[in-house]
C-alpha cells in the first residue's frame, strides 16, 4: 500500500528526496498533535502524511518551508551550543573493537569455540558468500 501512495505522491513533486522531507515534516506535525486533513482509520502518521500529499490536501511549498525552518532552528541551536560535537565520545564509553584490541583479539570480536560461521563479518568472510565460506574453511 505504501508503494502505491508514494507513486501517487510523485505527481506533486518529481524528486523522491523532497517527498521524503515533505512526508517527514507532515508526520512530525501529526505526531506533535496536528489534526489529519483526511480521514484514514488505523493508519500510521507516515502513511497518513503520504495520503494527504497524494490527495493534494496540503500546500507543498508551505510544508517544505516548515521543514527548512525546523532544520534552521536545529542548526542554530547546534552551532550556538557549547556542547562537544556528538562524534566525540566520552572516555568511559569504549567501543567493542577497542576493548577487543586491548584484550589481544585482532579481529575486534570475541574468540569463540563455536562453529566457524559464528563470525560472518570477519575479515576473511566479509565479502564471501556462504557457499565460499564453507568451501574455504573446510
Swiss-Prot record:
Transmembrane segments: none
Catalytic function, reaction form: RNA(n) + a ribonucleoside 5'-triphosphate = RNA(n+1) + diphosphate
Record key words, sorted: DNA-directed RNA polymerase, Nucleotidyltransferase, Transcription, Transferase
Biased composition (Polar residues): 126-138
Disulfide bridges in this chain: none
GO MF entry, a single one: DNA binding
Residue ranges of the region described as Disordered: 104-138
GO cellular component: DNA-directed RNA polymerase complex
EC number(s) stated in the UniProt entry for this protein: 2.7.7.6
UniProt keyword Transcription present: yes
Taxonomy, superkingdom: Bacteria
Listed SUPFAM superfamilies: RPB6/omega subunit-like (SSF63562)
Biological process, per Gene Ontology: DNA-templated transcription
UniProt xrefs under NCBIfam families: rpoZ
Function: Promotes RNA polymerase assembly. Latches the N- and C-terminal regions of the beta' subunit thereby facilitating its interaction with the beta and alpha subunits.
Assembly and binders: The RNAP catalytic core consists of 2 alpha, 1 beta, 1 beta' and 1 omega subunit. When a sigma factor is associated with the core the holoenzyme is formed, which can initiate transcription.
Family: Belongs to the RNA polymerase subunit omega family.
Protein name as catalogued: DNA-directed RNA polymerase subunit omega
Taxonomic classification: Bacteria, Pseudomonadati, Pseudomonadota, Alphaproteobacteria, Rickettsiales
Amino acid at each position: 500500500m505504501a508503494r502505491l501512495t508514494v507513486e501517487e505522491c510523485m505527481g506533486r513533486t518529481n524528486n523522491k528526496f523532497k517527498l521524503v522531507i515533505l512526508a517527514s515534516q507532515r508526520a512530525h506535525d501529526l505526531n506533535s498533535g496536528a489534526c489529519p486533513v483526511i480521514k484514514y482509520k488505523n493508519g500510521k502518521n507516515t502513511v497518513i502524511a503520504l495520503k494527504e500529499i497524494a490527495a493534494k490536501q496540503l500546500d507543498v511549498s508551505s510544508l517544505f518551508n516548515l521543514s527548512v525552518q525546523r532544520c534552521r532552528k536545529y542548526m542554530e541551536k547546534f552551532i550556538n551550543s557549547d556542547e562537544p560535537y556528538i562524534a566525540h565520545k566520552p572516555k568511559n564509553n569504549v567501543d567493542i573493537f577497542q576493548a577487543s584490541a586491548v584484550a589481544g583479539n585482532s579481529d575486534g570480536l570475541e574468540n569463540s569455540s563455536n562453529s566457524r560461521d559464528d563470525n560472518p563479518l570477519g575479515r576473511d568472510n566479509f565479502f564471501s558468500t556462504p557457499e565460499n565460506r564453507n568451501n574455504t574453511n573446510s
